[in-house]
Amino acid sequence: MIEKEVQELLSFIDGNPTAYHTTASVRNILLKEGFSELLESRRWQLEPGRSYFVCRNGSSILAFRMGEQLENYSFNVAAAHTDSPCFRIKENAEIHMGRKYTKLNTEGYGGMICSTWMDRPLSVAGRVLIKENDAITSRLLTLDRDLLMIPSVAIHMDREGNDRASYNKQVDMLPLLGGAAEEGVLKKLIAAELQVAEEQILGSDLFLCIREKAAVWGCNEEFISSGRLDDQECVFGILKGFLNAHCARSINVAAFFDNEEVGSGTKQGAASTFLYDVLHRIAQNVCPGDEDFHRAVASSFMFSADNAHAVHPNHPEYTDVNNCTYMNEGVVVKVHAGQKYTSDGMSMAVAKELAARAGVPLQYFANRSDKVGGSTLGNLAMAQVSMNCVDIGLSQLAMHSCYETAGARDIVSLIRLMEEFYASHFEETASGTLTISK
């Protein structure tokens, strides 16, 4: 039997082809749950027991719940990212090859597995900036049709194709839009979809997206596959746990950042001041001045959630001999001696204790010592606002493929861990001592 949470997760991912859609979906869920939207440009008047959220750039969102007893409060923060590797459409997009082919000019966004994007129906999604009187407004766009394809080269024309793992993104990876087409065909499609005049379109952030829906599979329905599991699976798990739990003595925060796949160094990325700005403004509403803010941060805790690599069934040698993970065996704690992950002895102890209280299994991941792994958002966010932090994720295969695979049972484990976390209060009671209570 497929868990309700799994069905909800897959529907969530299917409906969110870009970071802009993911942020809009989270925003709509929060509004339905009674949260109030704040603008960074306006004065904030926060009340105990109320719930709020703020968006930045339409692609990052921070939500928080005010406790009712905030004499010695802490921030309980869990963070994930809204973006995934894909291809961004360039500003002057159309390439017309005589009167034979029309292609789109694209560039890689993040470190995708290029071959997975070939020979499958694709479309276009993102945001479009529209002129409406004196205002520029942002509109979500999804061209809900099979529109493009990146064709591979026939084996007869490239006999070394199966041996070549290298792709030139400017040559091999440009998508075919059609045969002979008039200039401006893409803009016409966009204007028709949004029901605006072409002249109203002032700008856009558009990406290729796959058309294939998420699936549950395996002889015991134990696996799920979808685009963008990294990292919408963690976004969904954090959001569910955040909405399901409450602690009167804490301020719970769910933070979803854009641009993790390209380094997080944007105004809406985890390396920006977004998290600091929001936490500081919350603290100023609780008690003016910086003293209570610094006290709260010292007792605070953060989960940085980004998926982890599972042992590959055909290549188990790629993973560490005993710090390796499997799908459907629980939440992964990620550790790195070079501090690409924030996990240390204290933060891992906290994660272990919370998991035990929640009845959630934990497993541990470290790279092979002779391999260089990826990085994530936790250590970048900690450079702006420093608190105890642990890096976690869910185990998956084919990370950065356009269609990834994970365990069907793990999302429930993440939700339960987040529920326990958000129901807890943290307090630094002595140097090197963190007390966890309800």
Map each language-model feature to its residues.
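N-terminal hydrophobic/helix-forming segments and targeting peptides
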Residues: 1-438
